[in-house]
């Protein structure tokens, strides 16, 4: 897979590909990347890429010409082009999986109040929000998408590890709690079942804890899980 990122601040993006597991994935040729500076395509002598919004209002808007020129440069219309925005489609593990099947992605990093709608209308295939909150940096949101996608590529992560993670496709539950040495820490001990060596009992304990954590922290996912297995615990609303 190749990922192209369009950004006003490329220096935020580049280090992500040069460290830890991502560097290994790049070195092994599983993923390639290109970071494009939008400012390089601005015809303004100061390389400005924003302007005041038509109709008035707070903040500045990213101008269409420099981003359009950058998108034409990378031939974006032949690839899956994403704009990260708080008004986009909510990002999920399923969407990450769908994107991992694409051969090339182009991600536009938003800034300021937003992007001229005409760029979205002309070039963007998918407008994506990484959560119900607002970030000052579209680069941060872009890295969330990149990190979640590359892990699903063949050869990047051990497949067995992916099956046990939160939001895995077999059940959609959050992941169970983890423990490592020491056995006792500040009066808290590792659950005995994890030391028992009984793999079926460990598997059962982890599943129960996974359900409990999902019900507590993500009741919406818990209800989806109940719907999937065709059961109801009698609750009509959160406790």
Curated annotation (Swiss-Prot):
Write the record's keywords in alphabetical order, separated by commas: Cytoplasm, Methyltransferase, S-adenosyl-L-methionine, Transferase, tRNA processing
User: Which Gene3D superfamilies has this protein been placed in?
Assistant: 3.40.1280.10, tRNA(m1g37)methyltransferase, domain 2
GO CC terms, sorted: cytosol
Q: Which domain of life is it from?
A: Bacteria
Q: Recall the GO molecular function terms of this protein's record.
A: tRNA (guanine(37)-N1)-methyltransferase activity
Subcellular localization: Cytoplasm
Residues annotated as binding S-adenosyl-L-methionine are 110, 130-135
Q: Does the keyword Methyltransferase apply?
A: yes
Q: What is its EC number?
A: 2.1.1.228
Q: Name one GO biological process term.
A: tRNA N1-guanine methylation
- Catalytic activity, as annotated: guanosine(37) in tRNA + S-adenosyl-L-methionine = N(1)-methylguanosine(37) in tRNA + S-adenosyl-L-homocysteine + H(+)
Q: What does this protein do?
A: Specifically methylates guanosine-37 in various tRNAs.
Name the family the entry cites.
Belongs to the RNA methyltransferase TrmD family.
What is known about its subunit structure?
Homodimer.
NCBIfam families attached to this UniProt entry: PRK00026.1, trmD
How is this protein named in the record?
A: tRNA (guanine-N(1)-)-methyltransferase
């Amino acid at each position: 897979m190749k990922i192209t990122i369009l950004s006003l601040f490329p220096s935020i993006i580049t280090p992500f590909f040069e460290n830890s597991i991502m560097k290994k994935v790049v070195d092994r040729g599983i993923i390639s990347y290109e970071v494009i500076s939008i400012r390089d395509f601005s015809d303004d002598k100061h390389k400005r890429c924003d302007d005041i919004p038509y109709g008035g209002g707070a903040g500045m808007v990213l101008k269409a010409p420099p981003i359009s020129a950058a998108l034409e440069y990378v031939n974006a219309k032949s690839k899956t082009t994403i704009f990260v925005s708080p008004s986009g489609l909510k990002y999920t593990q399923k969407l990450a999986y769908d994107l991992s099947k694409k051969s090339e992605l182009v991600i536009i990093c938003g800034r300021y109040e937003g992007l001229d709608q005409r760029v979205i209308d002309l070039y963007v295939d998918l407008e994506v929000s990484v959560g119900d909150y607002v970030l000052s940096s579209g680069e941060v949101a872009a890295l969330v998408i990149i990190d979640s996608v590359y892990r699903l590529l063949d050869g990047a992560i051990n497949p067995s590890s992916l099956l046990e993670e939160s939001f895995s496709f077999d059940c959609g539950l959050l992941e169970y709690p983890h423990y490592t040495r020491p056995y006792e820490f500040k009066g808290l001990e590792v659950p005995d079942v994890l030391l028992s060596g009984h793999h079926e009992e460990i598997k059962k304990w982890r599943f129960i804890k996974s359900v409990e954590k999902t019900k507590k922290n993500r009741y919406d996912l818990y209800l989806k899980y109940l719907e999937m297995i065709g059961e109801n615990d009698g609750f009509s609303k959160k406790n």
